[in-house]
Amino acid sequence: MTQSTDYKEPVSILNREEITFSVEAETSHTEVFMSEVHSKPKIIDNAWETICSYPSLLKAHENARKGKRYRAEVLGFTARLEDYLLQVRDKLLDGSHELGPYRKLWVSIPKKRLVMALPYMDRIVQWAIYQYINPIFDKMMIEDSYACRVHKGSHKAAHKLQYWMRQVDRKPGDGWYYLKLDISKFFYRVDHEVLLRILGRKITDKRLMDCLRGIVNSRAEPFGLPKGKSPQEVPPGEWLYEVGMPIGNLTSQMFANIYLNELDQYCKHKLRIHYYVRYMDDIVILGKTKEELKTVLESVRHFLSEELHLELNKKTCIRPVRCGLEFVGLRITTKRIKLRKSTTMRIKKEFKGICDKYSDGRLNKEAFERRVASLKGLMIHADTRKLKDRLNGIYLRAIAKKQEKEGQKREDGRYSGTGGQSE
């Protein structure tokens, strides 16, 4: 089930003026309708034509190209934007759209995993679906779910957890404990049937569900792994079709939150847990005693197994709050939030590498400053004064070395006669 990434000239009985008038009228109608749709949680029905409308796809294109607008496939699509968006719309409405082939890339930071990316046209389709249904599902989620949500994020999750750790640390008694839940190979083990059943409780639009089913149950590409296996351990022919989501898909982030919202609701409303924080598949629960958290752990383990067909791995643990813990890539205690040692070492190594490339002329100033800013962003919400001082020294030495080399080049040009008047 693959599709060429070449875009064809759309066939239409309308001339250019009629198309423009139709698009403008459709834009006005859709903006009003979508504002009504997102005004409150509801059953999602009769949504497909709005999702596939020109203004919806145009907004999806604007979202999909952020940070990627100068890539060849994006430039090619943008060059004939209106024609291509109309073509996408027609394919979605007549049911002829099929997912294109995934591009695969192995990444090793922070750990080795397989990232998959769809062709640009399919990313637009996913954005169109996401921007319509995600706000509706988001209203069903608990306050303390922090991944891939507006006004949330990993740093807010870290600060909320630290706030609660400080609260319980002041309570009388022998000291509280935390339960850190680690779901085994979460993205590779999501059960398609369970996910579609959860989506189907809220979505009654048949064409929308058919499209989501095509994204989840891709027959062209398996996303799942056998229990206990890592991506690099499983040969291509042994990947599973009935479980798993592609890391890199926008919809996978949304599906992950929707899937684990079932656990959130169970913990908050059935087990009545107050101190509960989740960032994607990283979950921390605070409890008065180790015995209390052991009971919670068994209840959660049973729910995950029976309802979501997931398992916890050996990293799941119960320890005293006073010992601190690692969460969202940070080391959190009641007093400080620090980077993990592995993160600190990675930043040092990467920073030195880009500084060396810049001083040697292998990296231009714009790219250099952009990558430096990216690394600074990793440190902004943690106590990293010593690390910043060390990196600042490396940075200044790189700048000085670059200026020295540029000055030497000017001197060489001047004395060789290339920079002065000829005799």
What spans do the regions from the language model cover?
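Hydrophobic alpha-helical membrane-insertion signals
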Residues: H38-D83
